[in-house]
Regions:
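N-terminal secretory signal peptides that target proteins for export/translocation
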Residues: 1-2
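C-terminal motif of bacterial Sec signal peptides marking the signal peptidase cleavage site
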Residues: 17-18
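Short coil/linker segments at helix-helix boundaries
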Residues: 59-116, 123-244, 248-276, 310-341
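Extended alpha-helical scaffolding segments
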Residues: 281-325
């Protein structure tokens, strides 16, 4: 892709100030924000599980978790149901301290009632990891207070110990390793130790793609990587004979592209490999509007008018706000796909 085309695409899709003509305004007015039926199914599942959790109906949660671990179901976008189960217990970071303490008590009650439950301990470790980040905040390291760092470290250590206790149980859960990778990143586990944990995770469940997202994210330059590191890892993940191939490459880029104006211009990410992965996922999960919208957006970023035009044709005037953000980004990207001009 030429330097001039890349600059044009940046102006076209990133919502920078521009003179909107009547045609653009009319196109925006016609747009229909839509909902993804697969995401709606996920939200309904989470809501049901959250109600059981909030009401301390742990005896109802336990068999659900056990069945999901055994059958390993996926939702219609490739999302693992076990991951969505744990997501249903999450506490938003903007919640007041009193709410975090309330959730802490729920988790402790769960463990007290089911002391041999792998679900209860993994859920509590995940909560403690998020509780640690609640104390630290999202500021850069030099802006975090001394007290913030102290509590951050204490809660991460509590999460690590909870995971260690869970490891003494007979049952295994794929989310144990995903939570462990998050705790290890927060504790700045040395690279060899982190990689060993990752390989152990992949040996347990080779196609559980949350592990690869966690590792790639940790290799962003803002964390513990150097430019090119996460892209190289994506190549390695795609090459694993027991992995997801091009799909995992595309999933990694889908997870990280938001850190860049244009991930294909600013990094070594390969559009042809992302394209292959997106096409594979669209064939496997045809009901997912999220994947369809991401295909349109990423093909625009990749300068692939052929795929972009075809995908926007499938979308029509329907767009998913969670993917596009502002509607003008969708309209400008679609116009480029259809005409090649702004």
């Amino acid at each position: 892709m030429s330097k001039h085309l890349g600059f044009f695409l940046l102006l076209c899709i990133c919502g920078l100030p521009a003179c909107w003509n009547a045609e653009e305004k009319a196109a925006i007015a016609k747009l229909k924000p839509t909902k993804d039926p697969v995401q709606e199914e996920i939200y309904a599942f989470r809501l049901k599980m959250r109600a059981l959790y909030n009401n301390r109906r742990f005896s109802d949660l336990e068999p659900v978790a056990a069945e999901i671990r055994q059958t390993k179901p996926l939702f219609g976008n490739g999302s693992w149901k076990i991951a969505q189960l744990y997501e249903s217990f999450a506490c938003r970071r903007e919640e007041p301290e009193s709410m975090w303490q309330f959730h802490d008590r729920i988790h402790q009650d769960w463990i007290a009632q089911f002391p041999t439950s792998i679900t209860a301990r993994v859920a509590y470790a995940d909560f403690l990891r998020e509780y640690a980040w609640h104390a630290r905040g999202t500021n850069f390291a030099d802006k975090v207070t001394e007290e913030g760092w102290r509590i951050f470290g204490e809660r991460l250590e509590s999460a690590r110990k909870t995971l260690a206790d869970a490891r003494e149980l007979t049952e295994r859960d794929p989310m144990w390793w995903e939570v462990a990778l998050g705790v290890a990143r927060g504790q700045q586990l040395p690279k060899n130790g982190y990689n060993q944990l990752l390989e152990e995770a992949k040996a347990f469940e080779p196609k559980f793609w949350g592990y690869d997202i966690a590792r790639a994210s940790s290799l962003l330059p803002r964390w513990y990587g150097e430019p090119g590191d996460w892209e190289a890892y994506a190549e390695q993940a795609a090459a694993r004979p027991d992995g997801l191939g091009a799909e995992i490459y595309a999933r990694i880029v889908m997870a990280l592209y938001g850190y860049y104006d244009n991930v294909f211009r600013k990094t070594n990410a390969s559009w042809p490999q992302v394209r292959e992965g997106l096409i594979e996922m669209r064939q496997k999960y045809p009901r997912s509007l999220e994947l369809l919208n991401h295909t349109a957006l990423l093909s625009t970023l990749g300068g692939d008018r052929e795929l972009a035009k075809k995908t926007f044709g499938n979308l029509g005037d329907s767009y998913l706000p969670s993917v596009w953000g502002k509607p003008e980004r969708f309209v400008r990207s679609r116009k480029w796909a259809e005409t090649g001009v702004q």
